[in-house]
Design a protein with these regions (language model features):
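Short acidic-glycine-tyrosine-enriched beta hairpin
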Residues: 76-96
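Ligand-binding loop in jelly-roll beta-barrel domains
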Residues: 32, 94-107
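Short histidine-centered beta-strand/loop micro-motifs
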Residues: 48-59, 76, 99
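A short, N-terminal "cap"/entry segment at the start of jelly-roll beta-barrel domains
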Residues: 1-49, 55-56
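Conserved hydrophobic/aromatic beta-strand scaffold that supports enzyme active sites
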Residues: 5, 19, 36-38, 64, ...
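Short, conserved beta-strand element in jelly-roll/cupin
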Residues: 57-74
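A generic structural motif
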Residues: 44, 69-71, 79, 93-95, ...
Length: 107
């Protein structure tokens, strides 16, 4: 199964960030489907204000991915922040936030 970037529907397009997402991109155990996402993020983008009011003012979802280009700073509620850069695979557990240090492409 494959999909080209331009064929993934845009679900959010604001200055500094474009999010693309497609559901049903593979099956998970228990009958659930996986979604695939592609983010194009501009330097200086910080999602923390969008997360205010959520539990611990952070993202509650887990994320696995790969940084194609750029650099992100990940802040965790219960751990030191870390830098994720081009070529890195990542896992972000619940209760994190990100800000973009360098223009980034992330899947």
């Amino acid at each position: 199964m494959r999909i080209a970037r331009q064929d993934i529907p845009v679900i959010l397009a604001v200055p500094g960030a474009t999010a693309r997402q497609v559901g049903g991109f593979g099956a998970l155990g228990g009958g659930d489907d996986m979604a695939a996402e592609w983010f194009s993020l501009g330097a200086g983008t910080d999602i923390a204000p969008l997360l205010e009011g959520l539990e611990r003012d952070t993202c509650h979802a887990e994320h696995w991915g790969y940084v194609i280009s750029g650099e992100l700073v990940v802040t965790y509620a219960d751990a030191p922040e870390e830098v994720v850069s081009a070529g890195d695979l990542f896992f972000w557990p619940p209760h994190h936030s990100i800000r973009v240090a360098e223009d980034a492409e992330v899947i």
